[in-house]
Amino acid sequence: MPWIQLQIPADPDTADQLEDLLMEMGADAVSMEDAADQPLYEPDPGTTPLWSQTTVTGLFQSDRNIEQLLADIRDAWHQQTQQSLADIDVTLVEDKDWERAWMDDFHPLQFGERLWIVPSWHEAPDPDAANLLLDPGLAFGTGTHPTTALCLEWLDGQDVAGKQVTDYGCGSGILGLAALLLGADHVVGVDTDPQALEASRDNARRNGVEDSRLDLYLPGQDPDTRADIMLANILAQPLIGLAPRLAELTRPGGHLVLSGILFNQAREVMDAYEPWFVMDEPEQKEDWIRLTGRRKDG
């Protein structure tokens, strides 16, 4: 059975409302995509931005009357906004195993020489490597974004055996778990989102990591444990505000690894950390950079 696919262009002010309308009209699924291949840069605190050009896509069952469906959507939109909705692209798409098609798009990813991120349905390409089982599509990070890749590549290039690691803003736990698989002794993960902490714990168990090797906390509840390696893949402004706390939690001589920073933000972030760390030159991947440094004595 084919599906009726409706695609409607929207701006950031109307995309959420349009998504709700399509669901009210009986869509089986609604998604939003970037219509112009634009990156989303750092948002203001408390905002959830969308692209300046967004395509809202709704899938409807094929037994719907298309002309009536379009008329109902346009009428409802006009009632809600007093605006017209003329530009609706209609196509019929084949019915297929969408989950299988989605899974086929994702393959194991290698970071450096020793580390792989492997979707759970794939065989590990190198059974002797550090293979982190992690499924794409999680909201909290799976290694596909340049900011995460920069951190994973750094970890792969280090001797982390026996080290104490803190992953501040841990999300899925990807960085801390990678460190553990590469030989770190213990990881403290911190995140503002309780669901992220749950995701980290679930991923740890999936990878056979003992609970005793990974402690997870909300900010303000984490102990004053000083790390040999401090990882923080967040965003520039939160990183700037966290500089004193991350310095406090890093032992003298310990490594600092920061990501989630755009190239033009590097200097401001480096300035925030230089009172406590000797900072290295930035490492860039696409529009993003990684900052590293060593904790000064004292």
Curated annotation (Swiss-Prot):
Keyword flag S-adenosyl-L-methionine: yes
The keyword Ligase is annotated on this UniProt entry: no
Subcellular location: Cytoplasm
EC number(s) per entry: 2.1.1.-
Primary localization class, coarse: cytoplasm
Catalytic activity field: L-lysyl-[protein] + 3 S-adenosyl-L-methionine = N(6),N(6),N(6)-trimethyl-L-lysyl-[protein] + 3 S-adenosyl-L-homocysteine + 3 H(+)
Single GO MF descriptor: protein-lysine N-methyltransferase activity
Signal peptide: none
Keyword annotations: Cytoplasm, Methyltransferase, S-adenosyl-L-methionine, Transferase
Top-level lineage group: Bacteria
Residues bound to S-adenosyl-L-methionine: T148, G169, D191, N233
GO cellular component, one term: cytosol
UniProt xrefs under InterPro entries: Ribosomal_L11_MeTrfase_PrmA, Ribosomal_PrmA_MeTrfase, SAM-dependent_MTases_sf
GO BP term, pick one: methylation
One Pfam family from the record: PrmA
Top-rank EC class of the record's enzyme: transferase
NCBIfam families (UniProt xref): prmA
HAMAP family named among the record's database cross-references: Methyltr_PrmA
Functional description taken from the UniProt entry: Methylates ribosomal protein L11.
Family the UniProt entry places it in: Belongs to the methyltransferase superfamily. PrmA family.
Name under which the protein is recorded: Ribosomal protein L11 methyltransferase
Gene name of the encoded protein: prmA
